[in-house]
């Protein structure tokens, strides 16, 4: 795998980086699913991308492909019929085609403008049938491509935050204290409030404490523990 990332890989990174369009991933079966993941990784790290199912493409979805887009077609064998049907239309449209395959001598390998070689000696499947090793290698190649472009684009954590506002990653990068606060739920009493008013405010807001305000500024804090200690020391409280 390491040996397959060389000069052509650098050319592919530059081709995508300099492109004015998006990256369109295509494939079928398990290779198609890997294409979806690579498209998602590219999009979330600063390189606009989408996934186009090879079968759907020849049934109308080619309309989402622009001439300026770069195509990455994924097929272990390089001879999937759906890929063979699709590639001529993409070439006719003027798109640059990058083939990701374990078979450089295949249809895809020969028809591609650039090749991402993903060599596989044997699948992890005991019968050497189910795509396992091959899809892992494809995934690694896709991640290498995404991270290289991310670095080249100068993509920073603040950029990631803008397009990933949800989830734990989004919260870590994007969430601020102000996003979690609700002024209507903050317990607050004036400095002239009675003890009963303080107790009612703490009970209503259920935070175990209340801030004390004076002239619009916080002048103190009263907790339920403070109230208990006052009650223990004083018999007559108003």
Where on the chain are the PLM-derived regions?
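Short acidic active-site motifs
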Residues: 8-12, 57-61, 197-198
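An N-terminal, well-structured beta->alpha segment
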Residues: 1-18
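Short, flexible loop segments at the rims of nucleotide/cofactor-binding pockets, characterized by
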Residues: 1-5, 48-51, 74-77, 186-189
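Internal alpha/beta core interface subdomains
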Residues: 142-144, 149-163
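Glycine-rich phosphate-binding loops that contact phosphosugars or nucleotide phosphates
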Residues: 22-28, 32-140, 144-149
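The conserved cystathionine-beta-synthase
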Residues: 188-206, 231
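Tandem CBS (Bateman) regulatory domains
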Residues: 156-185, 219-238
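Short hydrophobic beta-strand segments in globular cytosolic domains
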Residues: 213, 218-219
């Amino acid at each position: 795998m390491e040996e397959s990332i060389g000069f052509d890989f650098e050319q592919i990174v530059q081709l995508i980086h300099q492109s004015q369009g998006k990256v369109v991933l295509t494939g079928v079966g398990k290779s198609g699913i890997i294409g979806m993941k690579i498209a998602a990784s590219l999009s979330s790290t600063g390189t606009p991308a989408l996934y186009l199912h090879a079968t759907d493409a020849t049934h109308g979805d080619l309309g989402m492909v622009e001439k300026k887009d770069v195509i990455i077609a994924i097929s272990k064998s390089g001879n999937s019929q759906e890929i063979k049907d699709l590639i001529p239309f993409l070439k006719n449209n003027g798109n640059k085609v990058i083939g990701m395959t374990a078979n450089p001598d295949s249809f895809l390998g020969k028809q591609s403008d650039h090749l991402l070689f993903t060599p596989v000696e044997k699948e992890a499947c005991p019968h050497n049938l189910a795509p396992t090793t091959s899809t892992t290698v494809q995934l690694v190649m896709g991640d290498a491509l995404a991270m290289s472009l991310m670095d080249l684009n100068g993509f920073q954590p603040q950029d990631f935050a803008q397009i990933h506002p949800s989830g734990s990653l989004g919260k870590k990068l994007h969430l601020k204290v102000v996003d979690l606060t609700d002024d209507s739920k903050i317990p607050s009493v004036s400095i002239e409030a009675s003890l009963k008013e303080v107790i009612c405010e703490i009970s209503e807001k259920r935070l175990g404490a209340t801030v004390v305000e004076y002239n619009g500024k916080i002048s103190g804090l009263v907790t339920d523990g403070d109230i208990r200690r006052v009650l223990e020391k004083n018999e007559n409280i108003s």
